[in-house]
Design a protein with these regions (language model features):
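Acetyl-CoA-dependent GNAT
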Residues: 5-92, 96, 109-111, 115
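Short glycine-rich hinge loops at helix-strand junctions in the catalytic core
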Residues: 103, 120, 141
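Active-site acidic-Proline motif in GNAT/NAT acetyltransferases
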Residues: 96-98, 102
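Conserved beta-strand-loop-alpha-helix junction that forms the acyl-donor binding cleft
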Residues: 100, 124-135
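Conserved catalytic-core motifs of GNAT/GCN5-like acyltransferases
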Residues: 125-127, 138, 143-148
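Conserved GNAT acetyl-CoA-binding A-motif
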Residues: 109, 116-129
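Residues forming the Rossmann-fold NAD(P)(H) cofactor-binding site
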Residues: 102, 106, 110
Length: 148
């Protein structure tokens, strides 16, 4: 079972590993704001941007690790308009294809929900285009609010 932890900063090695997870997910057809083929440079630039936001507390980054290293990640976007302090957005739920069907996504989701509760968030919002991901969220009790 993968272990989940929150990262407050990213090392260059972690950025490279997360870039690999992102590239794998995009290659596998994930709808996560990037098109295939995704270059390693572009993937690393994305994670560097995430790393730059972590110290400010506007974004929380969780990673799932197995004996080989990082196999999944999810983010909570915590900065919301002043009339929505109760809300956070769940973003970039990524699980490497080699680690799927092992409970990594469910473990990441539960950890993100717990972190949100600890931060006083009572509403979590996400979007997904994946039937597999939609089933994961439904099993965890999430409700569909609309289709775009």
């Amino acid at each position: 079972m993968a272990r989940v932890r929150r990262l407050q900063q990213l090392t260059p090695e972690q950025i490279d590993t997360l870039a690999g997870v992102l590239i794998d997910c995009v290659e596998g057809g994930a709808s996560v704001s990037f098109m295939h083929p995704l270059s390693p440079q572009r993937a690393r630039a994305f994670w560097q941007d995430v790393a730059d936001e972590l110290p400010g507390g506007t974004r929380a980054l969780l990673v799932a690790e197995d004996e080989q290293g990082i196999v999944g990640t999810v983010q909570l976007l915590l900065a919301q308009p002043e009339n929505q302090p109760h809300r956070a957005d769940l973003a970039k739920m990524l699980v490497h294809r080699r680690a799927r069907q092992q409970g990594v996504g469910a473990t990441l989701l539960a950890a993100a929900e717990q972190l949100a509760r600890e931060g006083g968030k009572t509403l979590l919002v996400l979007d997904t285009a994946s039937a597999d991901a939609e089933r994961l969220y439904a099993r965890a009790g999430w409700q569909r609010c609309g289709t775009v």
